[in-house]
């Protein structure tokens, strides 16, 4: 099936650490005996997820789905939490670990929202960029990549405010799917909500949906209730 869809050689082949032997060993033997070509260029075997230091197991019923986790955890916080761990190592999912991830992400957002109006040493900035790339080139070492991000954030907060630095910070975080959005004034939000309500009253649902999407892109969640529209502001936006 894989060779039919992806060709004789797959670029990246993933799977759980428990599949490395004998499952993937057999895949290699069978495929390369048939094609005479390398079956996969890179293998990414992920570690297991533990919850409160207990291995996740269907028989124990101690698992949680991503869908359920997102009911109480911001998507970017969850993504950031996983990025702080190397994918090959076991991950211990705990309430404290998630809270720590949220606190650390807020620190990075506060750093990002500083007024970047100064100048910096271009060579110092390039050194951070090179260090980040080197970390990610080391077997997708997101944990080390995040460490570099925090090192640069500390450097920024010591007075190195420049637009180029802000762009570099944003580019690094975007590698992990983390995108911060600019704040929207409450008056602007209320005005757009009123415009959406008028569009709905006129059965102009296309405009109403467009406004909802516009607000969502700015980190504003709308909730239609029998008492009217309620809205909440996400401190970071999930992409």
Regions of interest found by a model, annotated:
Residues 55-239:
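Structural preference for alpha-helix termini/caps and helix-kink/transition segments
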Residues 1-72, 78:
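Catalytic cores of enzymes that engage adenine nucleotides and/or redox cofactors via long glycine-rich
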